[in-house]
């Protein structure tokens, strides 16, 4: 490559990957103003200067049934990416998340001498740990958001760099509740519970009912309690409203399209499904209860596959049960309301415990707030420099 104008390939498969890719491209352009970027990009990466082979939306399929339905097209697109990369011979290939799509591409390209990075570790530390061997074959380096992920890769001698989490960079160490309430157009003197029942239809199906019934129980004890319900799109809003009409028609709720972050900052407590939302709640310093339910067969399988003590990212980061995790049968209205009630109570002991919890959240926030875009860019620069020297 020309030292100051590398050809850098990136493939993102969904919106979150597009955001990461754009941040990385912008950070790389500081060091390489003349770099060229090609691959599969969404609107933000395109705006940052990446030429895309096809619309990223073609890869954004979720759930087994949807993947199976679109499999011939996905395989065709993957073959197209591999062929294009072998023709173009980029100086480095960066697969952003989407491991089922990207790892095979990375493996094929690495075998042909192209340097590869996988950006965002798959949850290989939690389940399907045998994937570590494919990751080792496929990548020159993994970029990990969380420190315990790097520790896992180190055990298997897989090159990995901890870069911190982009979400920790985006959220202030001391979130501004007044500003969040203004954005949501709500009274900051009111008591709020944020309810996040998940982004997938199946999650809302399983969790909306126990979450709403828990809120009804809390409303009896705290009549001034208001519920904030951020949902990702119009389909989830309609689905949630139908369930609410059946199980909690009298409960006053403010339904929001998006604005989950502001809802969690404004809320006195958050009730949520496990996943990235739990990490976001921690960064928002929102005391939370994590609830999750699956089909009985899926739960039976998950129990046997998942290898970690905890399921929520705050607890995994702390290696401690910082926040309650109520799974399957334990995820019932009475349990959820009892744990949430501890956060809403006004007595001195509970306030002290809340302050201690928020301090733990702040300490964890600092641990993963590392300017991830710059760290990721530096990892790319270092690998390019190494390949130049060889």
Curated annotation (Swiss-Prot):
**GO biological process, any:** lipid A biosynthetic process
Q: Does the keyword Glycosyltransferase apply?
A: yes
Q: Which InterPro entries match?
A: Glyco_trans_19
What Enzyme Commission number(s) apply to this enzyme?
2.4.1.182
**Sorted alphabetically, which Pfam families does this protein's record hold?**
LpxB
Write out the GO MF terms. lipid-A-disaccharide synthase activity; phospholipid binding
Q: Which GO terms describe its cellular component?
A: membrane
Output the superkingdom of the source species.
Answer: Bacteria
Q: Which reaction does it catalyse?
A: a lipid X + a UDP-2-N,3-O-bis[(3R)-3-hydroxyacyl]-alpha-D-glucosamine = a lipid A disaccharide + UDP + H(+)
| Known pathway | Bacterial outer membrane biogenesis; LPS lipid A biosynthesis
The first-level EC class reads: transferase
* Record's keyword terms, sorted: Glycosyltransferase, Lipid A biosynthesis, Lipid biosynthesis, Lipid metabolism, Transferase
Asked if Lipid metabolism is a keyword of the record, the answer is yes
Protein family (similarity comment): Belongs to the LpxB family.
Give a short account of what the protein does. Answer: Condensation of UDP-2,3-diacylglucosamine and 2,3-diacylglucosamine-1-phosphate to form lipid A disaccharide, a precursor of lipid A, a phosphorylated glycolipid that anchors the lipopolysaccharide to the outer membrane of the cell.
List the HAMAP family hit by this protein, alphabetically. Answer: LpxB (MF_00392)
Protein name stated in the entry:
Lipid-A-disaccharide synthase
What organism does this protein naturally occur in?
Answer: Haemophilus ducreyi (strain 35000HP / ATCC 700724)
């Amino acid at each position: 490559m020309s030292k100051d104008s590398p050809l850098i390939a990136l493939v993102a498969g969904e919106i979150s990957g597009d955001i990461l890719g754009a941040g990385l491209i912008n950070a790389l352009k500081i060091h390489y103003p003349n770099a060229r970027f090609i691959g599969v990009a969404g609107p933000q990466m395109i705006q940052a200067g990446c030429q895309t082979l096809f619309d990223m939306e073609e890869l954004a399929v979720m759930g087994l049934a949807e993947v199976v339905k679109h499999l011939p097209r996905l395989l065709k697109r993957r073959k197209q990416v591999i062929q294009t990369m072998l023709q173009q011979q980029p100086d480095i290939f960066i697969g952003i998340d989407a491991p089922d799509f990207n790892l095979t591409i990375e493996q094929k390209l690495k075998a042909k001498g192209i340097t590869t990075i996988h950006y965002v570790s798959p949850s290989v530390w939690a389940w399907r740990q045998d994937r570590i061997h494919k990751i080792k074959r496929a990548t020159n380096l993994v970029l990990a958001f969380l420190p315990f992920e790097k520790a896992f890769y180190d055990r298997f001698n897989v090159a990995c760099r901890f870069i911190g989490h982009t979400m920790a960079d985006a959220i202030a160490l001391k979130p501004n509740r007044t500003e969040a309430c203004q954005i949501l157009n709500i009274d900051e003197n009111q008591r709020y519970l944020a309810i996040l029942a998940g982004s997938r239809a199946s999650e809302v199906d399983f969790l909306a009912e126990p979450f709403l019934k828990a809120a009804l129980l809390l409303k009896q004890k705290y009549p001034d309690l208001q519920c904030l319900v951020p949902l990702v799109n119009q389909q989830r809003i309609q689905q949630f409203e139908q369930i609410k009409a059946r199980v909690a028609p009298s409960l006053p709720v403010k339904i929001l399209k998006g604005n989950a972050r502001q809802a969690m900052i404004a809320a006195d407590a958050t009730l949520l499904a496990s996943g990235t939302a739990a990490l976001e709640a921690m960064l928002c310093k929102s005391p939370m209860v994590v609830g999750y339910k699956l089909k009985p067969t899926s739960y039976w399988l998950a129990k046997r596959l998942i290898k970690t003590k905890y399921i929520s990212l705050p607890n995994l980061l702390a290696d401690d049960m910082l926040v309650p995790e109520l799974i399957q049968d334990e995820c019932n209205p009475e349990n959820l309301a009892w744990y949430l009630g501890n956060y809403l109570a006004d007595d001195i002991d509970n306030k002290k415990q809340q302050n201690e919890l928020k301090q733990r959240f702040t300490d964890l926030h600092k641990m993963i707030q590392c300017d991830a875009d710059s760290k990721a860019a530096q990892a790319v620069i270092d690998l390019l420099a190494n390949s130049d020297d060889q």
